[in-house]
Amino acid sequence: MKTTNDFPTINERPPEGRKDDGSSFRVLVVDDSMFVAKQLGQILSSEGYEIVATAADGKEGVDKYKELCPNVDLVTMDNTMPKMDGITALEQIMAIDKNAKVVMVSALGKEELVKKSLMTGAKSYIIKPLDRKKVLERIAKVLQ
């Protein structure tokens, strides 16, 4: 005999880091700061996101995106990195996949840099230091 507890509630939905089918959103984290990459990874994985790879510079990030595409749902991208900056990496990722979902994560919050990132194809911009609530809200909104 079924009880009312056997049925999902109307407001029941998957955790933020999971798709409707229950699988995890897959994230590529690109940041030259190992501390920030680890912190971002912990925030996201604690909510069900799967960190599929990390990269320490823009060139490595683009290479990993090419390797993993289409199995990446989201890229987080720092702006200031060695070898290749975040805007250049963003341009290259958008050339590979015009539907790529990239969120810039940077200590630089200058208005012109934010605008350039968004005009280049970034879906959102998060300013460091990382605030757990803001990170999760922005990323969830991009993945809706």
Q: What do these predicted regions represent?
A:
Residues 1-26, 133-144:
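Non-catalytic signal-transmission and effector/linker regions of two-component phosphorelay proteins
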Residues 81:
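Receiver (REC) domain active-site loop signature in two-component systems and cognate sites
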Residues 69-76:
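Active-site beta3 strand of CheY-like receiver
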Residues 128:
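A Lys-centered signature of the CheY-like receiver
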Residues 57-60, 85-88:
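Acidic catalytic/metal-coordinating carboxylates
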Residues 34-53:
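Two-component/phosphorelay signaling modules centered on CheY-like receiver
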Residues 88, 109-124:
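Alpha4 helix (beta4-alpha4-beta5 surface) of REC/receiver domains from two-component response regulators
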